[in-house]
């Protein structure tokens, strides 16, 4: 089976697990993320506006915005890295590419921490996204300039120890789930 076929199969299984976990989400997951982000108060960070069954980081983003700049990703074109627009709680939002909400006014910012949505993850820091490569290109670009922390935010059910990965896949530094924090590279 080709790598692309293995990735498609892994995505399909992970989407089903994520959907089931999302149905049980009582909204407490964001507190674990808030706890992690509290150690980085004031550091520019980017979250994301959850879509469909993605775990929602909004409460943690609102808390972080009280201490420093928070952005959300903006897709500028196929094959391009993401840019980030400054987000403020309660600010006007509009539909962006693929239906993700983006700020109505685009004040660009550069994050040092990315809270990353995903379809599946591994404890080794592997991340399977939707297949567009946006976060891989973005992390590669940001990490070429400075240390950039990538925090996966997911349901524990999205873990896949046999994640099919490519050399261009950028690793996560940690993963936050409703069951706790997984620090990549630490036993």
Describe every region a protein language model picked out.
Residues 50-53, 119-123:
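Short glycine-rich anion-binding loops that position phosphate/pyrophosphate groups of nucleotides
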Residues 1-110:
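N-terminal active-site beta-alpha-beta segment that forms phosphate/nucleotide-binding
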Residues 1-5, 9, 16-20, 105, ...:
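Surface-exposed, charge/polar-rich loops and edge strands
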Residues 48, 73, 116-117, 152-154:
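Short beta-strand segments
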């Amino acid at each position: 089976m080709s790598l692309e076929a293995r990735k498609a199969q892994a995505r399909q299984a992970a989407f089903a697990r994520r959907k089931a976990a999302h149905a049980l989400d009582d909204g407490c997951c964001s507190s674990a993320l808030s706890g992690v982000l509290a150690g980085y108060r004031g550091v520019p960070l980017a979250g994301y506006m959850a879509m469909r069954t993605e775990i929602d980081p909004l409460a943690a983003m609102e808390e972080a915005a009280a201490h420093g700049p928070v952005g959300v990703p903006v897709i500028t074109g196929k094959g391009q890295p993401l840019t980030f627009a400054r987000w403020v709680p309660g600010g006007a939002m509009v539909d962006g590419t693929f239906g993700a909400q983006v700020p109505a006014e685009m004040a660009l910012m550069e994050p040092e921490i990315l809270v990353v949505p995903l379809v599946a993850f591994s404890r080794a820091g592997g991340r399977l996204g939707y297949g567009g490569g946006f976060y891989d290109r973005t992390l590669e670009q940001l990490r070429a300039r400075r240390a950039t922390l990538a925090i996966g935010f997911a349901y524990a059910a999205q873990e896949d120890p046999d994640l099919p990965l490519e050399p261009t896949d950028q690793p996560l530094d940690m993963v936050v789930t409703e069951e706790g924090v997984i620090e990549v590279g630490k036993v």
